[in-house]
Amino acid sequence: MSNNEKVLSPIEIKELERPQDFSAFQLKLASPEKILSWSCGEVKKPETINYRTLKPERDGLFCAKIFGPVKDYECLCGKYKKMRYKGVVCEKCGVEVTSSKVRRHRMGHIELVSPVAHIWMVSSLPTRIGTLLGVKLKDLERVLYYEAYIVSNPGEAYYDNEKTKKVEKYDILNEEQYRTISDLFEHTGFEANMGGEIVRDLLAGLDLFELLTLLKEEMETTKSEAKRKTIIKRLKVVENFLNSGNRPEWMMLTQLPVLPPDLRPLVSLDGGKFAVSDVNDLYRRVINRNNRLKRLTELDAPEIIIRNEKRMLQEAVDALFDNGKTANAVKGANKRPLKSLSEIIKGKQGRFRQNLLGKRVDFSGRSVIVVGPSLNMDQCGIPKKMALELFKPHLMAKLEEKGYATTLKAAKRLIENESNEVWECLNEIVDEYPILLNRAPTLHKLSIQAFHPVLIDGKAIRLHPLVCAAFNADFDGDQMAVHVPLSQEAVAEAKILMMSSMNILLPASGRAIAVPSQDMILGIYYLSLVKEGVKGEHKLFTDVNEVKIALDMGQIDLHAKIRTRIGDRIIQTTVGRLIIHEILPSFVPANLWNKILKKKDIGILVDYIYKEAGYEVTPRFLDDLKNLGFKYATIAGISISIDDIRVPENKIMHISKSKKDVIEVQKQFSQGLLTEQERYNKIIDIWTEVNNKLASEMMELVKGDKNGFNSIYMMADSGARGSAAQIRQLSGMRGLMAKPDGSIIETPIISNFREGLNVLEYFISTHGARKGLADTALKTANAGYLTRKLIDVSQNVRITIEDCGTHEGIEITDITSGNELIESLEERITGRVIAEDIIDPISNEILFAEGTLITEEDAKVVTEAEVKSVVIRTPLTCKVENGLCSKCYGLNLGEQRKAKPGEAVGVVAAQSIGEPGTQLTLRTFHVGGTASATQTERELKADKEGFIRYYNIKKYVTTDGKIIVANRRNAGLLLVEPKINAPFKGKVTVETVHEEIILTIANSTEEKKYFLRKNDVAKANELAGISGKIEGKLYLPYKDGEEVNLNESIVEIIKDGWNVPNRIPFASELKVEDGAPVTSKIITGAKGIVKYYKLTGDYLERRHDIKAGDIITEKGLFAVIADTEDREALRHYISRGSCIALNDNTEVEKDTVISAPAKNEQVVIAEWDPYANPTIAEKAGVISFEDVIPGVTVSEQFDELTGTSKLVINEYIPSGYKPTVILTTDDNEIIRYSLDPKISLNVSEGKRVEVADIIGKTPKATQKSKDITGGLPRVSELFEARRPKNIAILASFDGVVSFGKGLRNKQKILITDSTGNSVEYLVEKSKQVLVHEGEFVHAGEALTDGQISPHDILRILGEKALHYFIVSEVQQVYRSQGVNIADKHIEVITSQMLRQVSILDGGDTKFIVGDMISKKKFKLENEKIIKLGGNPAIAEPLLLGITRAAVTSDSIISAASFQETTKVLTEAAISAKMDMLEDLKENVVIGRTIPVGTGLYKDQKVKFSEQEISK
């Protein structure tokens, strides 16, 4: 609890009084005494009511004496009626005269003859009773169901006559064993028994303290991991009992509580039948069996019969508590299993989800929606009939207040007659009163918005066209629900926060969602088009009014180019655009409206106006835009005719050529030149190519048609409806179709819709269409479930304070996938608070100080300064105990302002991720065919300028002088430009002090120090390409103690980097030497004056002697673009070999060429064989073979093209053989190369090889079509933190690789660090190992192929690396589908997945090793222990999937209402868990104000202060 000192004591809930406000909720096991104290009497008979008199039977399940009167203040026999006898107990029928409401909470009890186990304690895993006794679940069940004996006192008993195996306490014996042993050892005190009694006695006899110490001792001595796990399980249960004050024997019931009768009602239906709650049937069975058992015991029946009856009693109680868990569930009259107490509370139809989290409410209605184009942004049309019903109470009050009616009855009559006064009053009420509209499915907060109602005739609700996008509504029969907010607070909230004019932005991304669509876009687009050579062209007008007059008089065309004055400038525009300009606020610059406005441009315009003017102006502007759009869409008269669909003339020619190509491919296939897969891929490629060619020709044709006024083209181009792909199907060719399994059918549909499809083509196309529909249905369900899980895990995240004061942050860069940018740094830092100063890499000035909230403009400044990474505060590094602080969260995107305390950011995050879920694809992508027909990479080219640095590169030089890469990893090429040059010749020293690196250069006479920030310098693992990005980081080419010459660069900025093996494969040929210059065309990035400088030390020295035409030969030359006041705007490095294009002091515009390479070609950095991985000779020497046996391990393959034959190692090598090539060098050193399957040998026995000669080549896996999990399944895989099936093994720390002796089907990889510690990994032989003997690997580097598990990233690289992994992976899925989601939402969920820790060492705390504890509890407990001077516990962070994280929530109610209800409740009851009711979900369930918004302060006294307002 927030203030831990508060001592909580249990509250007795009194009958008939409202329970007082409680601050926590706790579950415990009930003792028999407690059950008796609840009970108002024993239920002795199974009867319910008398079917003749319909009165409850005495002592039965509905007994009025026990549970209270059926009618208010009236006893059963009718002797006492009315209030005045309250509290009297009738002497005739024994019923207390009171309110009948007591039947909802008065309980009864059943006195059980024999103790019975509570099924949750037995079969809810881990079984609690079994764990305490140390008995397996199966055995425990056999004892409870009277099939086996449990030993309560072993005495001196043995299992055998030789007395070798002793009988222990709690051993389980079958009938035979029991007979034998008890005959032999009865006299020694041996006792065993079966059933509930003995289990209860054993539980009662447990000494928990003794058991605890025993277990702890055993834990320390045991070596076996499996045994430890079992001990930990037992320890947890024992500790739970000790801490909670529960007694173990309470898990066995001797008194069974009976639910109050009104909670298991018996309702009479018409026709004399009764609807009865299933629980009653289950209780009747228990009572029947209990009574029968009582009778049998009194009669002294034979043991076997009594035993059977006891077993049946146990089964009856089991069925009552949890009918689903029992093997053969009890079925009712309709052959359906009866709903037991557990089933009533769990599942979608259970108490939690059906009645507590979602309720039906009054003052609501629903109807079909139709469009209301004449409404304002915050209005909606409500049918009069509906309003009359919804506002009835308000209306009656109003009628009385105005004197139209004297009594309520009169008012009711007036309303029924619908007289004029009624409508008058209704209009007055409705005027000021907001209503809420909701469209199911309610996926995000914009699915419920408030409107001012406008009364209309008819029966449909009218909706404003611009809010459709937020509701995801259309008018094809959608329905919406209307709700009336009742309380003053609710009305205020609706008016201030929920009005649709306040909900213009999407909370997921901060972009405007209330933007015009379809017809409106078409109208605005039409208005903004230009037509050449029309009436009134090039005229000059004074203002818009003059233009309008001319237009109305027919003197000028709507699309004519004209000139007019706007502000103080004359502008060239068109009539239509002027009309648009008229509705724009005055501050909108011309470049936003004076152009053709498409959907995207309109969106940008709305965003801009919102940013500049906010809620005051935007709604009004949107309404004007809507009206304009509809008006001109109508005037334009755009309609589709069949002639608008233009088919390219040379379609037939293209298609016949493609058919020939296909026949050619088939021929090659039948001659055996192509494999089946290649044939298929080639055919698909042919058709894809022709389809694209036709499409581009057709688009040109349509675009030119009617000067760009072709209706279909206008619709697609403006973004109103349709797309290029759809036009292609109308008038190009339909193209290739997919089968339901996602594979592409190789026969394309050649026809288009204009020509019409033939039967076969139509049949092929039905395939895809049906799959689409089936997918959509599945997708909706999956997306809905994902949203539910996300909401549940993040519902308790809210902003609680302004600033948590942390200085920690996470470094972020662009998110890229390969070479494709997924999300830019600019987008990622907008609206975030930075955790470290942002420093300009060129001038070293502080651009923004720590703690600044970065706006969109600031983000642009950062990108223009070429800052490559920024450290921002994130929800993961926030230090607040409950929730987050405003600064770590950043901007509230839905309102574009700082998040305030009390905002439910967790729910918003979950909605933002879940809502677009339905737009994601469901399938896993099959790569192959068109999808991956990309050219294989065979070389690397540089596209920036600078010079080359080798990082760790080892090389072989071949006889003909080629440089071959000898590293397999941990090396790379860097493209750099100088940052600091050596001011004199000297020795370099590098030292790290805290967050700084001090670089000193010194000789006998002088010394100079340079200070660098540690974070700015590229780390070793970044240079090796393991983590992070290196562009923009600093590189130190000289190590500590090395000599450096004058003007050599000692600090360099990395502009690009290619690491081995990801970008440059092993054995590639390098085309550039270390230090070689790389030139490329340099273009100015800003406007200004070009000046040339030379770098000396760490400052620039002016050079006046550089002129156009010079070819640069010196290092360290920069061109600086300066503004008029000689401030540096940008600097460009000019590398050696560049030809200067501009003289010094030339004034330039943006995008002017400063210099270009003297030789006109792109610099190739490296080349390699794209189809094979070579094995090369490290030294010169002679080859010999081992285990290379033709017909056994190798086969000879004849190459048709070259006419030679080669040896190829077989794919499957018989066990016992290990084909190897042995190279004996000239120094008699022996190097062994073990040969992988499929490798083809380029050498023969006894052949001499030189350095870097190729020994053999392994073909790269012929492009297997890989299944890439994409779309929705990928997102849920990430959030569920699933361990991938094909998991990659990662190195746990930096070290050197070696291979140990392998097992039969596993190989052993060892990694040894610098101190000699080593760790070994066993890898399946079928896995491809990516490392080689003697290589150095970094922590987190993959040793084998496969997918990387997020758990490994967390374990090895920590939370920050995990943050990058999850955010970038989720963003890749959403961005590829065109969905924008801000990172902060994903981070909020990730921080919730990391809220648990796993205990490594319990110290002096109450935690046990292996416990999963929330970070909050862990911190509290540790603080407590440290105060007392003890040893704190040590833990490691755990990554839990969202389902696990939600179920392990600290709150009982929250976890129970999510999933696995019985498990959660059992756990909570045993450990007497306390729910502090801090989060949203539990407060919704118990019906209190939720702690967000103003509810955050509900416990605090609010003070009011008066203020004088000056008039």
From Swiss-Prot:
- Read off the Pfam families from this record: RNA_pol_Rpb1_1, RNA_pol_Rpb1_2, RNA_pol_Rpb1_3, RNA_pol_Rpb1_4, RNA_pol_Rpb1_5
What's a GO cellular component annotated to this UniProt protein?
DNA-directed RNA polymerase complex
Keywords (A to Z) from UniProt? DNA-directed RNA polymerase, Magnesium, Metal-binding, Nucleotidyltransferase, Transcription, Transferase, Zinc
Question: What is the catalytic activity of this protein?
Answer: RNA(n) + a ribonucleoside 5'-triphosphate = RNA(n+1) + diphosphate
Quote the record's binding site residues for Mg(2+): 474, 476, 478
Binding annotation for Zn(2+) 2: 804, 878, 885, 888
Q: How is the cofactor bound?
A: Binds 1 Mg(2+) ion per subunit.
Q: Which residues bind Zn(2+) 1?
A: 75, 77, 90, 93
Q: Does the keyword ATP-binding apply?
A: no
InterPro entries attached to this UniProt entry:
DNA-dir_RpoC_beta_prime (IPR045867), DNA-dir_RpoC_beta_prime_bact (IPR012754), RNA_pol_asu (IPR000722), RNA_pol_N (IPR006592), RNA_pol_Rpb1_1 (IPR007080), RNA_pol_Rpb1_3 (IPR007066), RNA_pol_Rpb1_3_sf (IPR042102), RNA_pol_Rpb1_4 (IPR007083)
Gene Ontology molecular-function annotations = DNA binding; DNA-directed RNA polymerase activity; magnesium ion binding; zinc ion binding
Q: Which domain of life is it from?
A: Bacteria
Q: Which cofactor does it need?
A: Mg(2+); Zn(2+)
EC no. given is 2.7.7.6
Instruction: Fill in the subunit field for this protein.
Output: The RNAP catalytic core consists of 2 alpha, 1 beta, 1 beta' and 1 omega subunit. When a sigma factor is associated with the core the holoenzyme is formed, which can initiate transcription.
Which NCBIfam families does the entry link to? rpoC_TIGR (TIGR02386)
UniProt protein name: DNA-directed RNA polymerase subunit beta'
Q: Which organism is the protein's source?
A: Aliarcobacter butzleri (strain RM4018) (Arcobacter butzleri)
